[in-house]
Design a protein with these regions (language model features):
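Charged, terminal alpha-helix-loop-beta segments
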Residues: 1-345
Length: 345
């Protein structure tokens, strides 16, 4: 039983499935464990039912979900969701993707370290990242481009003559410490936002992961919905293969038990929009044709950072959701190499 926030649903279901599997395996003679009851608060119900609908049929049939009231006195059985019901949920379509333009100031900053600095666009300006680590923000106010810098968003300084030395010191420290050649691997600049560092490398050339992927357009930190009521998080990368198949890419650089269920839920969200034609109409991939097939899921992690329970959890997912595991080199900061790729469910 659990009362928690929707964002914790993957952790809850992952740990529960592993406990259920291990306990069932230990019992070699009757009475066998035949059902898994999940008792949750109302806030967790919808995201949990969405994920249970993605499990393989035999396992899904063993699970019953109940909602407990706030006084923890009454249980109400929840009706399971069939897969087809997932596609009936109302969804807002995506707005058309505007052409990305880079301001003069942003171009000048990128030119100081073009292999390290990239830009993330938003409606209200541009965020500059050094190997994925945000360090500056550029906005145009009353026709004048202004730059704010600093790693702490709440304490960024406006770049002017009085702060020029601080700006130069920040760039110097980033060059020294946020580098694959950095000597001090314990430095905060080296350790911070590691997954964003990996994402930034793949954004530059996604074919390092799969030569069949199209380099651009490639969407990073892609949001299929707004708000966090159901624990909605952005997808690390949304890509398109040369054969027209969409690909959901989820990155991890440390062991994470939730990797599999996160990837499966991202598949559900992208597939719901694909079926409605939202992705094609928004021209997320320009005029390239998107195949009428569900997306693939690529789960990426360094070889020694894959969670020990990864395979067992992957085998809980329905086989029509194509999930692939990509093991990459441990020293990926110096360049990404795929060491192994395999279908896991």
């Amino acid at each position: 039983m659990v009362a928690s926030q929707p964002a914790s649903v993957d952790a809850f279901l992952s740990s529960t499935l592993l406990w259920f599997k291990r306990t069932s395996d230990r019992i070699a003679k009757p009475p066998y464990i035949e059902q898994l009851w999940l008792v949750v608060s109302d806030e967790l119900l919808k995201p949990l039912l969405y994920r249970v609908a993605l499990l393989r049929e035999g396992l899904r049939d063993q699970i019953r979900v109940f909602v407990v009231d706030k006084d923890l006195t009454n249980l109400t059985a929840a009706e399971p969701l069939e897969r087809r019901e997932l596609w009936k949920k109302k969804l807002a379509s995506f707005p058309p993707v505007p052409a990305a333009t880079i301001t003069t100031q942003t171009s000048a900053i990128i030119a100081t370290a073009p292999d390290a600095i990239d830009v993330v666009h938003s409606r209200h300006g541009e965020t500059l990242r050094y190997f994925g680590l945000p360090f500056a923000r550029v906005r145009t106010l009353l026709g004048v481009e202004k730059i704010w810098f600093g790693l702490d968003r709440t304490q960024r300084r406006l770049l002017d003559e009085s702060t020029l030395r601080e700006w130069e010191n920040l760039l110097h420290d980033l060059r020294v410490h946020r580098s694959p050649l950095a000597i001090d691997h314990g430095h905060a600049f080296y350790r911070s936002a590691a997954e964003a560092w990996l994402e930034s490398l793949l954004r530059r050339d996604i074919t390092q992961l799969d030569p069949g992927l199209i380099i651009a357009p490639l969407h990073a930190q892609f949001r299929t919905a707004r708000g966090g009521k159901l624990g909605i998080r952005p997808i690390d990368l949304l890509a398109l293969r040369q054969d027209g198949r969409l690909v959901v890419i989820e990155l991890k650089v440390y062991e994470d038990r939730e990797h599999v269920l996160q990837g499966a839920d991202y598949w559900r969200r992208v597939e719901a929009h694909r079926r409605r034609g939202h992705i094609a109409r928004a021209k997320l991939f320009g005029d390239l044709k998107i195949r009428d097939e569900p997306p693939l899921v690529y789960l990426v992690a360094p070889t020694l950072r894959v969670h020990p329970s990864f395979r067992r959890l992957a085998q809980c997912i329905a086989s029509d959701i194509e999930i692939y595991r990509f093991d990459i080199n441990e020293d990926w900061r110096a360049g990404v190499r795929v060491m192994r790729r395999e279908r896991v469910n």
